[in-house]
Amino acid sequence: LIEGHSHLLLHPYNETSWDNQVLREPEALRVARAVNHARATLQAGFTTVRDLGTEGAGYSDVGLKQAIEQGIIPGPRMVVTTRAIVATGSYAPKGFDPRWEIPQGAEEADGIEGLTRVVRDQIKRGADWIKVYADYRWGPNGEPQPTFTETELRTIVEVAASSGRAVVAHASTAEGMRRATIAGVVSIE
């Protein structure tokens, strides 16, 4: 079996909220949980997972993948995306005093140059796929709205493709899906 959309570095929100996992849990604790999640996933019969973002845990998915590949811990084969790419200001955590820089659950980038740099950096750090949020809940009343232009999404796809990587997009709106499809995204979640 293949799990096509996992987040091994998260645990259920009824245990701890997403904000608390990103802002309060040490990365080492999140990795320790991920080791258990990887083992349980394999024991459930999944031999491969596509892990679609560390949600604030940096590049820990790359190390988890390496530990499994080297036989240090049991787990399924992993295809990793490292840090999802989001438009500046569009993702979470939100609602904090604007004077403070708050750790983000994904990597913010904008424009052709910024997106090119971020995609290449993620590839350098071990991303097998690139994940982008084509839309998110950042409208005036928190409703989902597209986050990137078609040109920006096309840039992400072109840079990823130049190194043989595919792009997966989070999209829940018709316009976000349309833009992602036109840009050449391989998978929409």
Briefly describe each language-model feature range.
Residues 8-29, 88-104, 138-146, 181:
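Active-site gating loops and adjacent loop-to-helix segments of metal-dependent hydrolytic enzymes
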Residues 33-59, 75-84, 127-138, 166, ...:
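Divalent metal-dependent hydrolysis catalytic cores, especially in the metallo-beta-lactamase
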Residues 2, 45, 78, 122, ...:
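Conserved, mostly hydrophobic/aromatic
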Residues 94-154:
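Active-site gating/metal-coordination segments in enzymes
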Residues 1-70, 151, 175, 182-183:
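Metal-associated gating/positioning segment near the N- to mid-region
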Residues 1-5, 66-92:
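Glycine-rich, aromatic-flanked loop segments that form ligand/cofactor-binding clefts
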Residues 88, 132-189:
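Active-site core of metal-dependent hydrolases
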Residues 30-40, 108-123, 171-177:
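Short, acidic/polar
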